[in-house]
Amino acid sequence: MVRRRPATGAAPRPHLAAVGRGLLLASVLAAAASSLPVAESSCPRDNSLVRDISRMQQRNYGREGFSHITVTGALAHGTKEVEVWLQTFGPGQRTPIHRHSCEEVFIVLKGKGTLLLGSSSLKYPGQPQEVPVFQNTTFSIPVNDPHQVWNSNEHEDLQVLVIISRPPVKIFIYDDWSMPHTAAKLKFPYFWDEDCLPAPKDEL
């Protein structure tokens, strides 16, 4: 009796259309952002083991009712994996609608507000989810999901501690929730990194 060997041909690969469009788009966006060049910092680094936050530079970058402190960061302190910000939003203030290819975690230190979270699985963010946030809560932003943090409280400040991965941050900004992901505008270096990181030169 002759035994036949089973066929050894490779199993058929699933068609590309079977791959989730959202996953494909997210991977393309992440690859595009991660391929951007990063220049060396031109700022002196503070390598102190202990630093007094009350003595750190606090700026609003032209946004009334907003303040930002880089508590520890890639350009000013030489961190490689994470960066930490302390941000305060006055009543009614909000971030731009934006996305980035890094992980981001918020800890609400005081006040209350609203997280608006869009989708990266469509061609544009779409109608955002509105999620209430308040003191002693924490929330995380999925990589490349468009979002906005808004102090929707009319009577008190919203203060948050923000932790991001893969600094310095590369941010894509949307005009509104219906703007296609491919039309979002890159802002790099971001405002608080401009003093330490010059904008990339146009090589053309």
Swiss-Prot record:
It holds the Pfam family Auxin_BP. Glycans are attached at N136. It comes from the Eukaryota. A motif (Prevents secretion from ER) lies at residues 201-204. GO terms for cellular component: endoplasmic reticulum lumen. Zn(2+) binds at H98, H100, E104, H147. Residues 1-41 form the signal peptide. GO terms for biological process: auxin-activated signaling pathway; cytokinesis by cell plate formation; positive regulation of cell division; positive regulation of cell size; positive regulation of DNA endoreduplication; unidimensional cell growth. This is probably a receptor for the plant hormone auxin. This is Auxin-binding protein 4. It comes from Zea mays (Maize).
